[in-house]
Structure formats: C-alpha cells, structure tokens
C-alpha cells in the first residue's frame, strides 16, 4: 500500500463500518422501544403490506363480532316482549275457559270480558312500543333485520321481525266473544178501549158507549192472545185485525168483564249479551303457537349469532398471531443485535482513532 497523506483509506473503511454498526444499533433500539420489527416500509416492504392487510381483517372482524352481539341484543329484546305477550295470552285463555262455564251470569261474562280487553290492549301496546335503539321490532315497521358479520360485502345474517299484535294473532275481541243485541219484552199501558156499557140481544151483538183511540205499535204480540189480569179478573184481547167505523164493524173484539182496559208501552231496551265463541280456545291456542314459533326463531338466531361470534374471535386470534410473527419484534434477537452493535461501535471508535494516526507515519520519512 502506498504511503499517502491526502487519502486515509483505513480511516474511510473504519468510518464506513462504524456508520453501519451505528445504523444497526439505531434499528435495534427503535425495534426494542416500539416492540415492532417493521416500523416503516424500508424495514420489510412485503411484510408491511401483508401485516397491513391482516390489520384490516382483524379490525373488521372485531367490529363484526360487536355487530353480532348487537344482533343477540335485538333478538333478546324482541323475545322478552314476546314472553310478555305470551303471558297475556295465557291469562286470556284461562279467562276464556272460565267464561265457557255455564254457571256464569251475564255480569260475570262482562267482568271477564273487561279483563280480556285490557289484556288485548296490553298486547297491542307491547307490540307498538317495544324497540331497540329506536327500531320498533314487533310493530311491522321493519320486517327484516340485517347484521353485518364479516369484513366483506354481503357477509350478513338476516332474520325476520314478525309483526305480532291482536290482528296478526287473530285474537281480537270479536274473535273470542259474540256480542248480540236483543230487545227486552215490553209492557203496555194506556187507554185502548173504554167499554162502559155492553148489550147482547139475540143473535146480534151490540157494543155501545165505546170510545176508541188509535195507537201505532211497532211490533207484535208473542202469541195469538194476550191475557191481562188486574188481580181479580182476566181480560182477553184477540190478536186479529179489526176496523171500527161508524155504522160498520169488521172483525171481532171479545171482552170478558166490564172494566176499563189499559195498555202501556215502554220503548224496547237494547240488551248486549256476550257469548264465548265455540272456537275461542282453538283461536287462542293458534295465537300462542304463533308466539312460540317466533320465540323459537329468535332463540335459534341467538345461538347462531353466538356461534358466529366464537368463529370470529377464533379468526381474530389466528390472524393476530400471524400478524405478530410478521410485525412484532423478537426481543431476544433485538437485544442481541443491540449488544453486538454497541460493541462494534466501541471497537469502531477505537480503531478509527488508530486509523487516523496512520498518516503520521509518513511524516517520519521527512525527518
């Protein structure tokens, strides 16, 4: 090697090696401080891209797991409301069995009907007001719930939100009870015929001293003859058409006795009679069966969501482990690298000092 002063080759080599060890020491310290093997794309471009895709999947699957938990919450909320509807239907069925008993009076039936109506109103209230995060789940406002359970498009689970109320269950009050309106019988009072004299001669019959008033009656007698009794004598009124005119009498009016006959008429009264329909219990059984079917579907979807969550969590764990192998720093390796490069730094610094002294040997030739 030529003895030169302008260029100190040994010093340059030593500086280069010192820079390398310093850079390696810096990388080791960075990895140890961050815990990551890849802190930028320059550390491992391909590994960084793979790890980034893993991160996207992990984040998406973690959110999908939370979505599935929300799906469980929706189905649990809906099932809880259906359970209360079922309780009301069970009570209505119990009351219907009671109402079918022949020992009940109309008052008893009315009392039973009152509670049934309240229970039916409560079913409709539960249907209309049960909601999850502002979404009504039983009113038919939203017929289907879609839950995103994957990281890609169309990775969803859908389940129906059945409309459950009195109409869809077929248990409206008129489906269980018949309400018939009947007319009460009426009593009559008022002057109809005032016969103060009665004469019979031979084969001819004469009626004198009779005052006749005309009354229009909407209805009819319930038998061919009506028997009136004042406590001592009976009076017979024949059910036949007759016309009384001056000089001419058509038809027959027969009286027994010679007392004033009075008729009074009150307006017919509407009476509502409640009867339990023959198929009321079958109707209620069908309604309970519909509620049970909806509840079973919700229970099944809860189990499905739980299985989905378990699978998502397993996938997240596996992807996290794979990403860790690519992205995370191995502390044993990095500590070893740091120690090695620290030694190289110390050695390089010492050697550089020696290399810088090499040109001094050239000066000895000039003495």
Swiss-Prot record:
Swiss-Prot/TrEMBL keywords: Bacterial flagellum, Secreted
Keyword Secreted: yes
This protein's GO CC annotations: bacterial-type flagellum; extracellular region
Pfam family, one: Flagellin_N
Entry's transmembrane regions: none
Alphabetical list of InterPro entries matching this protein: Flagellin (IPR001492), Flagellin_C (IPR046358), Flagellin_C_sub2 (IPR042187), Flagellin_N (IPR001029)
Chief place of localization: secreted
SUPFAM superfamilies the record matches: Phase 1 flagellin
Domain of life: Bacteria
Subcellular location(s) of the protein: Secreted; Bacterial flagellum
UniProt entry tagged with the keyword Secreted: yes
GO MF assignments: structural molecule activity
Induction per the UniProt record: Although swimmer cells have only a few flagella, the elongated swarmer cells are profusely covered by thousands of new flagella synthesized specifically in response to growth on surfaces or in highly viscous liquids.
Summary of the function given for this chain in its UniProt record: Flagellin is the subunit protein which polymerizes to form the filaments of bacterial flagella.
Family, as annotated: Belongs to the bacterial flagellin family.
The protein's name: Flagellin 2
């Amino acid at each position: 090697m030529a003895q030169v002063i302008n260029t100190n080759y040994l010093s340059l080599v030593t500086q280069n090696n010192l820079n390398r060890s310093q850079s390696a020491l810096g990388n080791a310290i960075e990895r140890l401080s961050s815990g990551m093997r890849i802190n930028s794309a320059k550390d491992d471009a391909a590994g960084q891209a793979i790890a980034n895709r893993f991160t996207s999947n992990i984040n998406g699957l973690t959110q999908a797991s939370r979505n599935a938990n929300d799906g469980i919450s929706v189905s649990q909320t809906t099932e809880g409301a259906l359970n209360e509807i079922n309780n009301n239907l069970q009570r209505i069925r119990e009351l219907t069995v009671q109402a079918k008993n022949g020992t009940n009076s109309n008052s008893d039936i009315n009392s039973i009907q009152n509670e049934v109506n309240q229970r039916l109103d409560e079913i409709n209230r539960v249907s209309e007001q049960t909601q999850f995060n502002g979404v009504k789940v039983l009113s038919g406002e939203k017929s289907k719930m879609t839950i995103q359970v994957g990281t890609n498009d169309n990775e969803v689970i859908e389940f129906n939100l059945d409309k459950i109320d009195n109409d869809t269950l077929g248990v409206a009050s008129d489906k269980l009870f018949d309400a018939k309106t009947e007319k009460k019988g009426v009593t009559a009072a008022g002057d109809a015929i005032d016969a103060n004299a009665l004469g019979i001669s031979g084969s001819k019959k004469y009626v004198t001293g009779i005052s006749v008033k005309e009354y229009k009656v909407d209805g009819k007698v319930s038998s061919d003859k009506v028997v009136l009794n004042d406590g001592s004598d009976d009076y017979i009124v024949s059910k036949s058409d007759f016309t009384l005119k001056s000089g001419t009498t058509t038809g027959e009016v027969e009286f027994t006795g010679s007392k004033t006959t009075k008729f009074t008429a009150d307006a017919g009264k509407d009476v509502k009679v409640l009867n339990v329909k023959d198929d009321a219990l079958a109707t209620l059984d069908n309604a309970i069966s519909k509620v049970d079917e909806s509840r079973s579907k919700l229970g099944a979807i809860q189990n499905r969501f739980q299985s989905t969550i378990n699978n998502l969590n397993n996938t997240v764990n596996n992807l996290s482990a794979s990403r860790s192998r690519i992205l995370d720093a191995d502390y044993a390796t990095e500590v070893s690298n740091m120690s090695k490069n620290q030694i190289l730094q110390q050695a390089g610094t010492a050697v550089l000092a020696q290399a810088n002294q090499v040109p001094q040997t050239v000066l000895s030739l000039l003495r």
